[in-house]
Amino acid sequence: MTDERLRKRAHGVDATLRVGKGGIESVVEELDSQLDDRELVKVKFLRAARGAGTTDELATDLAERADAEVVETRGNTATYH
């Protein structure tokens, strides 16, 4: 599926994971598990997590650790495929 189609489908998806003060290490396995069950997963980066960097930086780091692809970041939320 093209990136544009994935972004369109992501619009209606709710965030199912939240990254807070525990950092991204605490959600890597859960993101991987959810991606096994669904095509798209949205992750919201709470203020406590964003102290470690920008949303784009955190999203990229999480994608590398979970072997996922960042479809898009918007505000404090990232969508993975």
What do these predicted ranges mean?
Residues 1-81:
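Positively charged, polar, low-complexity stretches
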